[in-house]
Every structure is written in structure tokens, then in C-alpha cells.
A protein has these predicted regions:
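ABC family nucleotide-binding domain
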Residues: 1-164
Length: 164
């Protein structure tokens, strides 16, 4: 587990006005932290900045002891479940779950072992050969969650994980 620290974080798309201003938060290892607010207030943008998918235009983001503002997403050692699930339609459930492991060059045996474990945990064992279009919304959501869990990252960001 790693500490996540947002120090005076701001976000501007036009360099004139901030859509997120001066956020200061420390999330300790093992802590369960929830962002709550009305639609359009910047919750998803904040998660995307932590993940490295959106530029931080002000302040400092630390993961562990390391400042990560300019670190690419692949180097941040975290996983993310997206609001829209972000599944690859041409891949099977099994391939979607394993995608990040394949990119990280995890052995086939280890990928398969982790996939079986997480599929059992989330009730997806019977769906591993199906494509996302063959699944209900709740099943797709569980595939996205499985893909995040299977990576065993110390930090997991979830954008509206219970929306379905």
C-alpha cells in the first residue's frame, strides 16, 4: 500500500480559470477514500489526474514518496475502473481481464492463475469466453473490476463503480 497525497492540486483547461482548485488531501495506506459530489464537479477529472490520464496544471501529486506529476500512467503502479468500463469489444472477457497483465509481460501461467481466481471471486467463471456485447451491464462492470483487481496494484481508483 502507498500513501496518495494531493498538495494544492488544480486543473485548468484554458490556463485562465480552474475547474478544480487547491485540493489538499492525504490518503493513507489501507484507507478507503470516497469522492462525493454533484455531477460535473470534477470527481472523474480528479481520478484521471491521479491516474495520469489528465494533466495536473497546478500543485503536486505524490504516490508514496515520489512526485508523479510527470510520470506516465504505466509507471504509477495503480489500477482504475472507468465509469464506462472501457472494455475492448473484440476481446473475450478473459482477454479483457488479462490485458494489463499481458502488457506487463506477466507469464501466461500467472495470468491464467490470477484470472481464474478473480473470475471465481466475481462470479465470472462461466463468461470467460464471451465478448462484452454478450454480457449484461452488471457483468461488464464486474469484468472492469476484475481487470483492476487482477493487476494487484497497491492503489485502485474507481470512477462510479456502483453506477449499474
Amino acid at each position: 500500500m502507498k500513501r496518495v497525497e494531493l498538495i494544492d492540486i488544480s486543473k485548468s483547461y484554458d490556463k485562465q480559470s480552474n475547474v478544480i482548485s487547491n485540493i489538499n488531501v492525504t490518503i493513507e495506506p489501507g484507507e478507503f477514500f470516497v469522492l462525493v459530489g454533484p455531477s460535473g464537479c470534477g470527481k472523474s477529472t480528479m481520478l484521471r489526474m491521479i491516474a495520469g490520464l489528465e494533466e495536473i496544471t497546478g500543485g503536486v501529486l505524490k504516490i508514496g514518496e515520489q512526485e508523479v506529476n510527470d510520470l506516465p500512467p504505466s509507471k504509477r503502479d495503480l489500477s482504475m475502473v472507468f465509469q464506462n468500463y472501457a472494455l475492448y469489444p473484440h476481446l473475450s472477457v478473459e482477454e479483457n481481464i488479462q490485458f494489463g497483465l499481458h502488457v506487463k509481460k506477466i507469464s501466461k501461467e500467472e495470468r491464467n492463475n490470477r484470472t481464474i481466481e478473480v473470475a471465481q471471486m466475481l462470479g465470472l467463471s462461466d463468461y470467460l469466453k464471451r465478448k462484452p456485447r454478450e454480457l449484461s451491464g452488471g457483468q461488464r462492470q464486474r469484468v472492469a473490476l476484475a481487470r483492476a483487481i487482477v493487476n494487484q496494484a497497491p492503489i485502485c481508483l474507481m470512477d462510479e463503480p456502483l453506477s449499474n
